[in-house]
């Protein structure tokens, strides 16, 4: 079977994608799959890669530029888009593969784009009665002014007062369509707020502002198409105030714990809520569902779901699936099987 891995991409998570691809390529069973890799540069150019060290600076050495994308893609039996963030996890690459009529790993177009957009995902999760941390939607208009937008689309220019009144400080400012904690900032005071909002808006003109809670970060992996299975719950042990990009991929002092150090009843609730959230976006294939456990109140909140979670050797999704009995080679087999079933 001819398997194509696609990595890189134009998002801020370009480097993470390449690290994930290294791990998937290493673990894909070469007796089952003829594995090739296409790399997408930050400028959006596609290359047929020769080097297998996709995370190195020389990853394009010896590569051939791909100009006829459809013809190239249609030469494969299945595609694994190992792409995170915009132009990869947001339904765009999925739409291209749908048009080319090629089976691919992961969620389809609508689930991908909805889950990637924190603002619209929150609306769906509200409809599914899944608790979430109190939040506000801030938009940077095309005239560069910031406004708070309510559920009926009404705009308020009193951004600082709205956030201070409804959420208070500290709070978190998050670019709506960014992942791996890129464009995510903790704001401790009113004087920090506007600069951080503008910084987040550099990644996405749509921004979510959430109330900060004294939280333990918990994660659950789901897998399946019609029949969804959920892993045990894992716990993030960040080296710092919250799980930043650096904590996830660069800080060796950050750690994970499986199972999480919370009551079994909390873990059972999270596993059920993870499946519910995955179904709410009509997910297929896989996702990592992220939750907050409020240490002060005991409440559990859904943070977000990631439809193409990190696959590095330290990423939580493959760790959770290994704990569930699927090591990375077997996990790749199962994800490809699910892709071919659709």
Stretches found by the model and what they are:
Residues 35, 103-104, 132, 171, ...:
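Hydrophobic beta-strand scaffold residues
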Residues 185-272, 299-301:
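Phosphate-binding site of ATP-dependent enzymes
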Residues 211, 220-222, 278-311, 321:
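Conserved metal-phosphate-binding beta-hairpin within the catalytic cores
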Residues 235-287, 319-342:
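Active-site "cap" helix and flanking loop/linker of ATP-utilizing ligase/carboxylase catalytic domains
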Residues 1-7, 11, 19, 73, ...:
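Active-site nucleotide/adenylate-binding loops and adjacent lid/helix of ATP-dependent enzymes
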Residues 85, 181, 236-239, 306-320:
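Glycine-rich phosphate/pyrophosphate-binding beta-alpha loops
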Residues 1-110, 114-120, 139-155:
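ATP-binding N-terminal substructure of ATP-dependent carboxylate-amine bond-forming enzymes
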